[in-house]
A protein has these predicted regions:
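Conserved small/polar residues in nucleotide/adenosyl-binding loops
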Residues: 181-187
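Transmembrane-helix motifs of polytopic, lipid-linked glycan transferases
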Residues: 116-133
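Membrane-embedded helix bundles of polyisoprenyl
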Residues: 139-158, 162-169, 173
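Short hydrophobic/aromatic helix or loop-helix immediately within or flanking a transmembrane segment
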Residues: 61, 65-72, 76-108
Length: 191
């Protein structure tokens, strides 16, 4: 609870600092100030989500156990799981286990995986907020709504769903750009 308030206060203070600079810089620097605020907010959310203890959230510990189990799976087991899920209709989350296995090629540290998931979730969110707002205050209000409507809790407890949400933010951007070839990648991965 206190961490959410700290994030909101830090972002508010940074926004006020940027507004003071904006008055001195002029209109050209305003877009850069918006981008800086969006990046700052995104980094805070990544840190909040990625550096949490495994005891935070009811599912984080179970996700950690699942992560360690699936890092030990062979690629053949991952392939068989895909076939079981998508052809036989048995099991679930084949895309998530594939993501875990791919990630385990680089690191088997669960905390690093949580930071990676934070990046996958919050970079698209930050980009979405930046592209769909016009003022510094809009970015802060978006962060305020995110924190107060318990979506920050969702990103801590539902890792698979949070990853899917990150892909949805990317998909919205692709739809707006009418780039359907990029849209098929996130929707077919079924994370």
């Amino acid at each position: 609870m206190y961490l959410k308030v700290i994030i909101l206060v830090l972002t508010l203070l940074y926004m006020l600092f940027l507004k003071l600079q904006y008055k001195q810089i002029g209109t050209i620097g305003y877009d850069k100030a918006r981008k800086n605020l969006a990046i700052f907010s995104t980094l805070l959310l990544i840190l909040q989500s990625g550096l949490r203890h495994v005891g935070v959230g009811p599912d984080t510990y179970q996700y950690m156990l699942s992560f360690h189990e699936h890092t030990l799976w062979t690629w053949q087991q991952i392939l068989h799981n895909f076939i079981d899920v998508y052809q036989a209709g048995e099991g679930k989350d084949a895309g998530y286990y594939l993501l875990v296995k791919l990630f385990s090629e680089f690191s088997t540290d669960y905390q690093v995986f949580l930071v990676f998931v934070g990046i996958v979730v919050f970079v698209p969110l930050g980009r979405f907020v930046y592209k769909n707002t016009e003022r510094l205050e809009d970015i802060w209000v978006a962060l305020l709504l995110y924190q107060t409507l318990f979506y920050s809790f969702f990103s801590v407890t539902g890792i698979r769903q949070a990853i899917a949400t990150g892909f949805c933010f990317l998909s919205v951007e692709c739809i707006k750009a009418v780039s359907y070839t990029h849209l098929t990648l996130p929707t077919t991965s079924r994370v």
